[in-house]
């Protein structure tokens, strides 16, 4: 069974894990109603995507 020859230091362990953090989702602004929305998705408040109504306003 493989066993490490030397102890991994706290600094080396933390440097290895430096890129493992989670990034928050990027929010853009809806050009129609100025509400925050996720990119490449229809606006949840007004139902438009790329200037076209894709979800009817009665459904929202």
From Swiss-Prot:
Pfam families associated with the record: Ribosomal_L32p (PF01783)
GO BP field: translation
GO (cellular component) term, any one: large ribosomal subunit
Gene3D superfamilies: Single helix bin
InterPro entries according to UniProt: Ribosomal_bL32, Ribosomal_bL32_bact, Ribosomal_zn-bd
Biased composition regions of type Basic residues, renumbered to the chain: 1-16
Disulfide partners: none
Disordered: annotated segments: 1-20
UniProtKB keywords: Ribonucleoprotein, Ribosomal protein
MF-aspect GO terms: structural constituent of ribosome
Family stated for the protein in its record: Belongs to the bacterial ribosomal protein bL32 family.
UniProt name for this protein: Large ribosomal subunit protein bL32
């Amino acid at each position: 069974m493989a066993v490490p020859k030397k102890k991994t230091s706290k600094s080396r362990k933390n440097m290895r894990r430096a890129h493992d953090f989670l990034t928050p989702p990027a929010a853009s602004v809806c050009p129609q109603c100025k509400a925050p929305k996720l990119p490449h998705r229809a606006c949840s408040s007004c139902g438009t995507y790329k200037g076209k109504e894709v979800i009817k306003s009665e459904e929202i």
